[in-house]
Amino acid sequence: MTFNDILHKFRSESFTQKDKGTQFERLMRSWLLSDPRYSNLTKVWLWDDFPSRADLGGKDTGIDLVARTEEGDYWAIQCKCYKEDSVIDKPAVDSFLATSSRQFKDPETLQTTSFAKRMWISTTNHWGKNAEDAIQNQNPPFNRVGLVDLQNSPVDWQLLIDGLKGKEAMLPGKQPREHQLRAMSAAHAYFQEHDRGKLIMACGTGKTYTALKIAEDLLNNKGLVLFMVPSISLLGQSLNAWCADAVNPIKGICICSDSRASRKIKKDFDDTQDSVCLLYTSPSPRDMRRSR
């Protein structure tokens, strides 16, 4: 069952919009606890189950899920099961921005804290200009998960519907092909005697995947890798692919030198709506600020 099949099922079988929204929120909770890009999440609450919701108004005023990371940061998450051609307008995001700006007591430490990230999950990628303007340069930062990101997630959606999550809900992993195995073997032998080298492969032969497997082999699935790319879009594509195919979870620290990266540049191929916006780092930006 594909993600599109799930959407069709929700839309055709739900009695009300609220019923459809509730099913979607529960599915997104399971997805966040399964997709390897979010492996640093230790807990994801439905809004009604979040212990500190009273500090944020109690009622459902824009936040659908709350997630906690390994580092103790909290994310405010909104889930919208829209039609694919729907356009998100500013009123739709205003209450989410307002509620996620408030402070609350950390359920673990009982200390006053605030959200470190905002995440907006929706089944449409269309944003109105006023809504687009409203989410720029926000603190905490605003990150988007769109339809394409959900469709390309390496999870088995049927297993999520059946109640499984985590590694049990992942699609079967890739296996290296013969030409990739030869490249991996050659790289392993080469780096026994050299500090640097170059691997040249044709388009469509799996360079990103082969590079991942070479890195895992050289580092024995632990250590640090410096991965440099010339554009934001390649950063997003590469890290998404590595997270999906890695043997062990990857903790990525994404650093961008492009001053335009925080703005939407319509004429730039590296549009900030690219899925790189969805990649989360460990340590968190908040922890990195503390260490300065």
Regions found by a protein language model. Name each.
Residues G252-S282:
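Inter-Walker segment of RecA-like/P-loop motor cores
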Residues T208-N221, A241:
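Walker A/P-loop NTP-binding motif
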Residues H194-K213:
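Walker A/P-loop
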Residues K20-S114, G128:
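Catalytic centers of nucleases
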Residues Y280-R292:
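Single conserved hydrophobic/aromatic residue that forms the stacking wall/gate
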Residues L224-C243:
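Conserved Walker A/P-loop ATP-binding site and its immediately adjacent core
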